[in-house]
Amino acid sequence: MSKTAIIFPGQGAQKVGMAQDLFNNNDQATEILTSAANTLDFDILETMFTDEEGKLGETENTQPALLTHSSALLAALKNLNPDFTMGHSLGEYSSLVAADVLSFEDAVKIVRKRGQLMAQAFPTGVGSMAAVLGLDFDKVDEICKSLSSDDKIIEPANINCPGQIVVSGHKALIDELVEKGKSLGAKRVMPLAVSGPFHSSLMKVIEEDFSSYINQFEWRDAKFPVVQNVNAQGETDKEVIKSNMVKQLYSPVQFINSTEWLIDQGVDHFIEIGPGKVLSGLIKKINRDVKLTSIQTLEDVKGWNEND
């Protein structure tokens, strides 16, 4: 029997104008967008719609903006009935809202705080990330270990699809890998426009603060399994999920294993909810036989609601 997973993108998918088509054109989406505006301590709708101050790319703003867009799309969709959900990094919080582990209002506060802690963890220029293209995980892991020392580290951070592994760590080592990448066998090594060494062990510095912050909110058992980035399997227990969301800060995103786990459970239809088609592109490189649907806009929502 066919099974469906709803999936949510992470940072990098944001763009100016995001969710503007939903606002005032769909009551359910407008409710989420208005709730975000009323919950947060900055003008999130201005940042998402026009970004006149150029702040959308700052992680403490990007994170609530993406969660809000995905959640607004989700609220507007009818007859979804997913069997599983999965998000990439930040996108996992949209999964938690979808599976009713967190209320949207609590989730948007949590990702705002997550972004602030991540931004404050290191001074600008200390940590960074890069995408390594054309090498498998074992080779990238080996290169990272050879470059790392007692006082500087570089580690695999996002295991996205065959031939695309994102690494994270001290900027000096990221720069060295970018420079040496081709000689080490990579097709390309592309530096990413991020302000810190996300999903590396360096992020353990914020573990305690983040853990104590999220403990003040109500976490519920998931209504359907959330496939978690840190262990690539479906979880429903609220305490396991919460613990894994803390570990997620400093652990690699196991996207290949997560996708393969879902396919092993019988999932043959992935519905990506949020801006862009990044995850659909990754899944195509993991398995070409599954069906992929992208829901990015009001028109996509209307198409789904009319056809389903």
UniProtKB/Swiss-Prot annotation:
Pathways per UniProt: Lipid metabolism; fatty acid biosynthesis
GO cellular component terms listed in the entry, alphabetical order: cytosol
E.C. numbers: 2.3.1.39
Keyword annotations from UniProtKB, A to Z: Acyltransferase, Fatty acid biosynthesis, Fatty acid metabolism, Lipid biosynthesis, Lipid metabolism, Transferase
InterPro entries the UniProt entry points to: Ac_transferase_dom_sf, Acyl_transferase_dom, Acyl_Trfase/lysoPLipase, Mal-CoA-ACP_Trans/PKS_FabD, Malonyl_CoA-ACP_transAc, Malonyl_CoA-ACP_transAc_FabD, Malonyl_transacylase_ACP-bd
Biological-process GO terms, alphabetical: fatty acid biosynthetic process
Keyword Ubl conjugation set for record: no
Residues forming the catalytic site: 89, 199
Record bears the keyword ATP-binding: no
Reactions catalysed, as given in the entry: holo-[ACP] + malonyl-CoA = malonyl-[ACP] + CoA
Pfam families recorded: Acyl_transf_1
GO terms of molecular function: [acyl-carrier-protein] S-malonyltransferase activity
Family: Belongs to the FabD family.
PANTHER family named among the record's database cross-references: MALONYL-COA-ACYL CARRIER PROTEIN TRANSACYLASE, MITOCHONDRIAL (PTHR42681:SF1)
Protein name (record): Malonyl CoA-acyl carrier protein transacylase
Originating organism: Staphylococcus aureus (strain COL)
